[in-house]
Design a protein with these regions (language model features):
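Long, low-complexity, compositionally biased intrinsically disordered regions
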Residues: 1-150
């Protein structure tokens, strides 16, 4: 994933700050009501489709991508056409974040199972090797050790 990947800058808090409370809440409602019909991600962009509330209208097509100055988007709804960040774009972004959270949880569960087959010595050697180059990991390991000593 490069520096221009949507995943590097797309977070719930950032999105809420960009769009404002009202639009963010309306996007959450759009997602929770099952109107997001699909979301796909590629490096640097998200694409999705949202069912409109009004019967007979065509689904809204949403695209979110990264520019040098932040997130950019397109939506075929009237609000999106006026270049405002709409609830449909928020719903697509939130659907992506939800999907990513589930994916990571599954990966971590599988990793936990795999780690049970690794010797304690190999795990310790690997952790120490990574802690030598990752200050955050080093501090996390120190915290774990300090708690265990109590």
């Amino acid at each position: 994933m490069g520096g221009n990947d949507v995943a590097n800058i797309l977070h719930r808090e950032t999105l809420a700050m960009i769009v404002g409370t009202r639009t963010f809440e309306r996007g959450e409602q759009c997602l929770s009501s099952g109107r997001v019909l699909g979301v796909e991600s590629a490096i640097g962009e998200l694409c999705g489709v949202v069912r409109p509330m009004e019967a007979g209208r065509r689904p809204y097509e949403v695209r979110i991508w990264v520019r040098e100055d932040g997130l950019a988007y397109q939506c075929t709804c009237p609000v999106g056409a006026s270049r405002q960040f709409c609830k449909h774009a928020v719903a697509i972004a939130l659907a992506h974040l939800q999907k990513e959270t589930v994916r990571v949880e599954h990966e971590l569960a599988a990793l936990r199972v795999d780690l049970m087959h690794v010797s304690m010595a190999a795990l310790l050697d690997g952790l120490v090797a990574h802690a030598q180059v990752d200050r955050g990991l080093l501090e996390a390991l120190r915290t774990i050790c300090n708690k265990a000593k109590r």
